[in-house]
Amino acid sequence: MENAVWSVIKYTPKHGCSDEFKMALERLAEIMNKPDLTWSLIELDTGEIVQISRIPSIDAIVEGQIAGLEWLDSVDHLLEKDEEGSRTQAYSGLELDAPHSFQVKN
């Protein structure tokens, strides 16, 4: 069985654009609405939004990549960019099958 992939993506809405960005997250929710995806959004006290996703495989990531990038392009004007021009701060990696993981069923 292929390991699942976890992804953590942080978005920083521009000042005054937070409400519009949150409304745009509804379109992202439609893209992410797949039975095999687990994901959630949290809002930090800094106003940043963090998307945490568990995707069942690398193939599933590739499958949704175009729709995800199109969504990100559609909200580009609402997001702060870092000094290199990136709209997000993102991390991803393969899920470890560890005994303490909440994914392990007893």
Please identify what each model-predicted range represents.
Residues 2-4, 44:
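Short coil/turn motifs at beta-sheet boundaries
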Residues 27-39, 54-92:
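An amphipathic, aromatic/His-enriched active-site/gating alpha helix that lines ligand/cofactor pockets
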Residues 40-46:
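A short beta-turn/loop motif at secondary-structure boundaries
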Residues 89-106:
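Short, low-order "capping/linker" segments at domain edges
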Residues 13, 44, 94-96:
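A compositional/biophysical signature of low hydrophobicity enriched in polar/charged and small residues
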Residues 13-15, 55-57, 106:
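Non-catalytic surface loops within mature trypsin-like serine protease
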Residues 10-23:
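Short, surface-exposed ligand-recognition loops at beta-strand->loop->(often short) alpha-helix junctions
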Residues 4-11, 50-52:
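Active-site-flanking beta-strand signature of metal-NTP-handling nucleotidyl enzymes
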